[in-house]
Swiss-Prot record:
Organism this protein belongs to: Coccidioides posadasii (strain C735)
Active site: S188, D389, H451
Biased composition range(s): Basic and acidic residues: 594-604
InterPro entries to which the protein is assigned, alphabetical: AB_hydrolase_fold, Peptidase_S10
Signal sequence segment: 1-34
The protein, known as: Pheromone-processing carboxypeptidase KEX1
Keyword Protease: yes
């Protein structure tokens, strides 16, 4: 009897143990997945106020860049609507320091604009037509990003290090984008950020081991609008620009006051200030112009001199879309849709004063000193300016280009004494500006544009982007924009009215479909193996028991086995049949795409000055109240986007 009892209980005991082990394995596996996020955790399934039509493919959320200090950067990524000849990703940064890139996402180059604080409309001329767009709130503490209160960063090299860490982790989440052509774009104080990040990426690529060559990042270009890049020339341009635009008149008391401030600025620059990003005396030149133009309680808008604003805001209430963005980004349903972490304990702010006041960059040299090396490394740079911006005006940009030396020449010098001509640009029959270029550097002046060029001229800015990216729709289809340089069309670019698909896009879809099935097959292998092992063990003991107990009434000994219906395994079969499968066609094991994306036409592997608007430290203050402004050097009366 003892022997029979042993044989009859052993299969049941082992089956019970196996079932418990599988249950524990499933729970532990789920907990591991919960701790380490994957792409589907960032997928934006719906967006409050979205316009009619299919939702654009986007992801959003936080990536940790400083574990010790709980530093996390927030991103919002939009997948391109169409694919040209190859995959491209543009990373957009606003300035400050401390101003959110959601300005760029919702007021400039993103696919949506806010009609009011609860309604989104499509942005004609958005930059996501043929490029993936990645908006990042940085440094830590900016916008939706966060960090422990006492751990804000201070220098540009710290910022660049954090950003490289962000990209390392972001590409782990989204490996299908790691081999895209990579471009950085931004405005204002991003003129400091972007060259530092570019230098850090170039250094990273140089230091990458032979074994890791496949993880080289394909940095292809920089695009900076109204950037704060070279304080020496740009500070001195305030007086010149004020006279040129007739903001002050020579010989008047107002002009004399500005000239005195200008002289004090020159003295500080000559006393060791030329290698600093911030010169306190020079900030007073801009302040003086704003003060002397005050009339009936209003002053010029420092971001668009054609407009006036309440003094001392002088542009901080502009652009008008600002009044919609803050309430929209503080809505609970929007916060949830964008996967904003609970650790972000304060509401979204356009510009964060604590970030600005801590980011003094005292030991950082102006980014203009990095540009020659970047250009000489083969990275093209386009600088563009809105002609009506005062705070980072085009005269200052043109002056530092004229003085800068790189690749054996000075400025736009083609040969000694011969300068590159300015090429007139017309867009749809209107004078749009001009282009000038030499030795990998291009300069574009936008006529009648403000500090935020894409806000004023979205379609023209997209035309500039497509030219810079090398998008040519000749073999794609669609209606080309009537854009001409010196009367010649050149490469055809498309702004709106795009085709439903492109040849490259069809190829990409076929690859994605194949990769999707491959990924599902791969993900199913583990479950199949587990089920096969369980079935084999179960079958073995049933077979052995029957041999030992032939005719002993198997059902009577194990009555509960009949209760293990197919429904008991439904959890394994349906593990992926959750809402995460909404994006099954894209957020599978993305590493399957590493050998698929962009292999047709390119090689793999290697090869605001301050804020628009300002900071609101009081969560309960009215959204329309005056906000603290930010100049590239934290000047109390100016700002930058």
């Amino acid at each position: 009897m003892r022997s029979t009892s042993t044989f009859t209980r052993t299969p049941a005991f082992l089956l019970h143990t196996l079932a418990r082990w599988l249950l524990v394995w499933g729970v532990l596996g789920s907990s591991v997945v919960a701790e380490k996020k994957c792409a589907s955790n960032y997928y934006v399934r719906s967006l409050p106020g979205q316009p009619d039509g299919p939702l654009l493919k986007m992801h959003a959320g936080h990536v940790e860049v400083d574990h010790k200090n709980n530093g996390n950067l927030f991103f919002w990524h939009f997948q391109n609507r169409h694919i040209a000849n190859r995959q491209r990703t543009v990373i957009w940064l606003n300035g400050g320091p401390g101003c959110s890139s959601m300005d760029g996402a919702l007021m400039e180059i993103g696919p949506y604009r806010l009609k009011d604080d609860h309604t989104l409309i499509y942005n004609e001329g958005s930059w996501d037509e043929f490029a993936n767009i990645l908006f990042v709130d940085q440094p830590v503490g900016t916008g939706f990003s966060y960090v422990n209160t006492n751990s804000y960063i201070h220098e540009l090299d710290e910022m660049a290090s954090h950003f490289v860490t962000f990209l390392e982790k972001w590409f782990e989440l989204f490996p299908e984008y790691e081999h895209d052509d990579l471009y950085f774009a931004g405005e204002s104080y991003a003129g400091q950020y972007i060259p530092y990040i570019a230098k850090a990426i170039l250094d990273r690529n140089k230091n990458t081991t032979t074994q890791a060559q496949s993880r080289l990042w394909n940095l292809k270009g920089l695009l900076i609008g109204n950037g704060w890049i070279s304080p020496v020339e740009q500070y001195q341009a305030y007086l010149t620009y004020a006279y040129k635009e007739n903001l002050i008149q020579s010989g008047t008391d107002a002009a004399k006051r500005v000239e005195r401030a200008h002289s004090e600025c020159i003295s500080e620059l000559d006393s060791g200030g030329k290698d600093r990003i911030h010169a306190g005396a020079c900030e007073k030149v801009l302040s003086a112009v704003l003060e002397v133009t005050r009339e009936n309680g209003k002053c010029i808008n420092m971001y668009d001199i054609r407009l006036r604003d309440e003094f001392p805001s002088c542009g901080m209430n502009w652009p008008p879309d600002l009044k919609h963005i803050t309430p929209y980004l503080r809505r609970d349903d929007v916060i949830s849709a964008l996967h904003v972490n609970d650790d972000k304990r304060t509401g979204w702010r356009e510009c964060t004063g604590a970030v600005s006041s801590n980011f003094n960059a005292r030991n950082s040299k102006p980014s203009v000193q990095l540009l020659p090396e970047i250009l000489e490394s083969g990275i093209p740079i386009t600088l563009f300016s809105g002609a009506k911006d005062f705070i980072c005006n085009h005269i200052g940009t043109e002056q530092f280009i004229h003085n800068m030396q790189w690749s054996g020449g000075t400025g736009f010098e083609l040969s000694p004494g011969v300068w590159a001509p300015r090429h007139d640009w017309t867009f749809e029959g209107e004078a749009a500006g001009y282009y000038q270029e030499a030795r990998n550097l291009t300069y574009v002046l936008f006529y009648n544009a403000s500090h935020m060029v894409p806000f004023d001229f979205g379609r023209r800015s997209r035309d500039m982007l497509d030219r810079f990216l090398g998008v040519d729709i000749t073999s794609i289809g669609g209606n080309p924009a009537d854009s001409r340089i010196d009367g010649e069309k050149g490469a055809l670019t498309s702004v709106g009215n795009h085709p439903n698909s492109t040849t490259a896009e069809q190829r990409e879809k076929e690859k994605l479909k194949a990769a999707t099935w491959a990924a599902y097959y791969k993900s199913g292998e583990v479950a199949l193996v587990v089920v096969a092992i369980a079935a084999a063990v179960w079958g073995f003991f049933i077979w052995r028991s029957r041999r030992q107990r032939q005719g002993s009434g198997y059902r009577g000994i194990y009555p509960n086995l009949n209760g293990l219906s197919s429904g008991s395994f439904s959890g394994f079969r349906n593990k992926r049949s959750s809402h995460d499968d909404i994006e099954a066609a894209a957020d599978f094991d993305a590493s399957e795409l590493d050998t698929l994306r962009g292999t047709d036409d390119r090689s793999r592997g290697a090869n605001g000055h301050g804020s628009v608007g300002g900071d609101s430290e009081d969560e309960d203050e009215k959204f329309g109240a005056q906000k603290e402004s930010y100049h590239p050097s934290n000047m109390p009366s100016s700002s930058s986007s």
